[in-house]
């Protein structure tokens, strides 16, 4: 990537999903090519500040408002640009600020840099060349969602599903692999919706698998109803796809899944798990769960706990239900008291932790390839193909973004501990 002389300074703030992370990296690369220099010290003001926000929950909105205020305070003369879902969901907040911010809609995210500069020039393409501070590269393949789950505000903020051209995606992945990235994560708001003409997500993965130099392919997250026969075959048969999936659950109760407007049942979810494990009995899963959805009974909650144990997730991301205006669930009866949600979430976290550690115990004595993501002092940390977090003492020199063979010796609070072999 060609860099011009320094014309000014910029700061980037990213909140939320992996798609947002991809977009912020694209802004970083565009600005660098244009000759702007990134400021990483929060105490040093910049000329331009861009914040990519999230509004998936009320808590995410609150974090976004705080981050915007902080940017305004720390960068008193900067041009503040806000994009992402908070800009779509809470325009009143920005109208109430003493400081004027430029709002760029989600639909115009890819043209953000063009919109904020008035001078006439050829702007760099909205794509990534690397992924700052990451050992894996997130590649956005799709945006928007057509599912309209009853709790989710995202379709109203990001719009309908739109897929990127496969050729652009493949070229972008080849570029980051050439830069030395071993692992790419196929990311989107609803990745299972991906479709470029006759090219499905399955065919895209098969083509990514053929890119010279790629070592690992993951899908950021996917719903069980999107796992078609073709996609299952692509994931389990491709040479570089990892034997793990973030398979979204949300609830283990059929009645709650129906009220959520999810497109699968408890049985469908378990069938999907078993199908993957037929190809690899050790196939690993992580998931998301919403705790305290309106009407969630004690039995519904027990159903969720039981499926966590039955599947043996290595990690569960749990979220308290957050009532979002414009969604169907916002008006549902039988809202669960906050204290009950808090207690259930705490208990679910304890169960999930125990289950995850039990699953990792099964790996002890094995040797696995770890992609190094961080080296702190004499300890390196990364993930196995099964997405288990692995730490090990450094022997000699171990570089970030390299694959290292590690024998797994024990399980501790944060994951597996091993030794280089």
Swiss-Prot record:
The keyword Phosphoprotein does not apply. One of its GO terms (molecular function) is tRNA (N(6)-L-threonylcarbamoyladenosine(37)-C(2))-methylthiotransferase. Binds 2 [4Fe-4S] clusters. One cluster is coordinated with 3 cysteines and an exchangeable S-adenosyl-L-methionine. Transmembrane segments: none annotated. This is Threonylcarbamoyladenosine tRNA methylthiotransferase MtaB. Belongs to the methylthiotransferase family. MtaB subfamily. It is found in: Cytoplasm. [4Fe-4S] cluster 2 binds at residues 145, 149, 152. The keyword Iron applies. Its EC number is 2.8.4.5. SMART domains: Elp3. Keywords: 4Fe-4S, Cytoplasm, Iron, Iron-sulfur, Metal-binding, S-adenosyl-L-methionine, Transferase, tRNA processing. It is an enzyme of class 2 (transferase). Its cofactor is [4Fe-4S] cluster.
């Amino acid at each position: 990537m060609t860099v011009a002389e320094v014309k000014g300074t910029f700061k980037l703030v990213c909140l939320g999903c992996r798609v947002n992370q991809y977009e912020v990296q694209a802004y970083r690369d565009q600005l660098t090519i244009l000759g702007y220099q990134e400021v990483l010290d929060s105490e040093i003001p910049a000329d331009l500040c861009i914040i990519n926000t999230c509004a998936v929950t009320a808590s995410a909105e609150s974090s976004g408002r705080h981050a915007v205020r902080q940017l305004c305070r720390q960068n008193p003369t900067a041009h503040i640009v806000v994009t992402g879902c908070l800009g779509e969901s809470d325009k009143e907040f920005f109208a109430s600020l003493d400081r004027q911010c430029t709002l760029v809609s989600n639909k115009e995210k890819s043209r953000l840099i063009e919109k904020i500069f008035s001078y006439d020039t050829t702007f760099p393409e909205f794509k990534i060349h690397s992924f700052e501070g990451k050992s894996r590269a997130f590649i956005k393949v799709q945006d928007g969602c057509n599912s309209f789950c009853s709790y989710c505000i995202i379709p109203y903020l990001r719009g309908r599903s739109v897929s990127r051209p496969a050729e652009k995606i493949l070229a972008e992945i080849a570029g980051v692999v050439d830069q030395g990235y071993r692992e790419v994560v196929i990311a989107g708001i609803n990745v299972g919706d991906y479709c470029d003409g006759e090219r499905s997500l399955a065919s895209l993965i098969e083509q990514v698998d053929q890119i010279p130099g790629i070592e690992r392919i993951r899908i950021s997250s996917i719903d069980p109803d999107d796992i078609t026969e073709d996609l299952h075959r692509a994931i389990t048969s491709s040479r570089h796809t990892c034997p793990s999936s973030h398979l979204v659950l949300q609830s283990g109760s059929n009645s709650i899944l129906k009220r959520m407007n999810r497109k699968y049942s408890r049985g469908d979810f378990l069938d999907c798990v078993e199908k993957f494990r037929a190809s690899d009995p050790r196939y690993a899963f992580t998931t998301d769960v919403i705790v305290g959805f309106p009407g969630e009974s004690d039995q519904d909650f027990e159903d969720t706990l039981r499926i966590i144990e039955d599947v043996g997730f290595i990690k569960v991301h749990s979220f308290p239900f957050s009532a979002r205006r414009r969604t169907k669930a916002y008006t549902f009866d039988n809202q669960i008291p906050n204290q009950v949600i808090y207690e259930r979430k705490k208990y679910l976290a304890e169960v999930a932790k125990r289950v995850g550690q039990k699953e990792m115990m099964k790996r002890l004595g094995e040797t696995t390839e770890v992609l190094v993501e961080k080296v702190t002092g004499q300890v390196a940390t990364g993930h196995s193909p099964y997405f288990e977090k692995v730490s090990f003492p450094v022997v000699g020199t171990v570089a970030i973004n390299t694959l290292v063979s590690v024998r797994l010796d024990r399980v501790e609070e944060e994951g597996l501990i091993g030794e280089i072999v």
